UniProtKB/Swiss-Prot annotation:
Coiled-coil segments on the chain, per record: none
Membrane topology label: Multi-pass membrane protein
Gene Ontology terms for molecular function: proton transmembrane transporter activity
Assembly notes: Subunit of the F-type ATPase which has 2 components, CF(1) - the catalytic core - and CF(0) - the membrane proton channel.
The organism of origin for this protein: Caenorhabditis elegans
Keyword field: ATP synthesis, CF(0), Hydrogen ion transport, Ion transport, Membrane, Mitochondrion, Mitochondrion inner membrane, Transmembrane, Transmembrane helix, Transport
Official protein name in the record: ATP synthase subunit a
Entry function: Mitochondrial membrane ATP synthase (F(1)F(0) ATP synthase or Complex V) produces ATP from ADP in the presence of a proton gradient across the membrane which is generated by electron transport complexes of the respiratory chain. F-type ATPases consist of two structural domains, F(1) - containing the extramembraneous catalytic core and F(0) - containing the membrane proton channel, linked together by a central stalk and a peripheral stalk. During catalysis, ATP synthesis in the catalytic domain of F(1) is coupled via a rotary mechanism of the central stalk subunits to proton translocation.
Keyword field contains Magnesium: no
Pfam families for the chain: ATP-synt_A
Amino acid sequence: MNQVYFLDIFMFVFVLQFLFYFKESMLNTLVKKFLNSLVGVFSYTNTLPLSSVISIFTFIVLLTCCFGGYFTYSFCPCGMVEFTFVYAAVAWLSTLLTFISSEKFSVYMSKPGDTYLKTLSMLLIEIVSEFSRPLALTVRLTVNITVGHLVSMMLYQGLELSMGDQYIWLSILAIMMECFVFFIQSYIFSRLIFLYLNE
């Protein structure tokens, strides 16, 4: 039974052709449908096309980090402050540099008809508001991922203690809850980046 037969290899290669090789392969079609559904979910506009690319990339990277960390080490890197802060700072910096390079930046910093004192005070408020965004993104993502992990594990442990450990569906339910938390938090983070880019 441990021998590999020619027909097994042939069937494996035959199926791989349909998955990867052809122009309209299953994997290519699946990726296209997934990206089109993301465009529908995020409700992108054509006014700032780069923002959709950045937020879809952010969404996919966060999902990959969450699922990769969870299924290999049972704790995702988005629950760690260091990873989340660096990722939020880079994402925020891309939005800030995009905003500074636009023509709206000078109008945003000094409104016509305002006095110098009001302009200075509003400038300080806007600077504090801009620089607090990566911290807010970091805290929001880290706390929500960690709390989601803890709540789903507490529910799993409570159900396991009350019903016993013979039910495999409890493990599946806990994993599905974790995956739902990952999906929602990745969506919220990338949606906030999209909104920051479209300001």
